[in-house]
Amino acid sequence: MITKDNSSKIIRGFTLIELLVVIAIIAILIGLLLPAVQKVREASAKATCSNNLKQWSLAIHNYHSTFGSFMPAAVANPNRISWPVFLWPYVEMDNTANKYDKTLGFWQPNNTIQNTHNGVCSTTAKIYYCGSGRQDAKWQGDSYWRARSNYVINWGPVRMPLLGAAPQTYSPWGYTDFSNRASPRISNLDKFPDGTSNTLAFSEVLMHDNDAAADFRGDFINDDTQCGRFMTIDTPNSGVDELSGGWCVNDAVKMPCIVSGNGKIAARSRHSGGVNASFCDGSIRFVSNSISLVTWQALSTMNGSEVFDPNY
């Protein structure tokens, strides 16, 4: 009987050239897939951001249903309460709202415990942050550590303070003049001659990556001046330097600023081409960086009677 001897069979491996070809093919596939993955990730982040703005917009209407008016942007005297505090009960943050002591300033115990994140104001929530950025950003620029947010209210085409401008023409929110700590004005749905669908409510800002940096963009629990607001003096993601009045860290690429002047903070995001914005009727729209300044400013007033192209 004749048998075949397989002991001498040679098993040949890949040659170096073949390995290089395989690696090159894999690299090409990765290169083709990465942009698609990044687009999906950004689309998801953008959708999350839009949903968060929707929740804030619903909150102001629920507040209005309860009190017959929108919340003030800030109440200076005696305890300096900023707008998020009024809306916590309407964004499923009842526990935080119940722990916050409205008889004390936001910087006082137990609202804020100096140099720690143990105070009520340090409580963070997903609704504070856009999916394109950090989900835990906090302010550590002074002793009173607190949460920050990508979401801020419309302050209109004016700097802070309002410098004597008639406030009812501009932002729909009650305001506190920084120079004299005046009582806030209250707005309701009867005071929107321009229409709630044509009046901005919220949009986005970028925050500095370093919590310890004294950059108050997104410092929305602080009632002072620019904190927690955006202005429409410049279009979204403008390359024009923002004026901080002393509290910003310049990032010439995404967050340009000058540490001087009366405050102006532009709407900004990491989304490609523009920012998400909510309107006072609860609708959410993506606003392009290329929107005309005239239209952008018209959208930020509640009683300006401006005429603009609705197809912005």
Please annotate each region the language model reported.
Residues 1-9:
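N-terminal secretory signal peptides that target proteins for export/translocation
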Residues 3, 14-17, 21, 58, ...:
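Generic hydrophobic-segment detector
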Residues 10-45, 55:
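N-terminal single-pass transmembrane signal-anchor helix
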Residues 43-312:
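Surface-exposed loop/linker segments characteristic of extracytoplasmic
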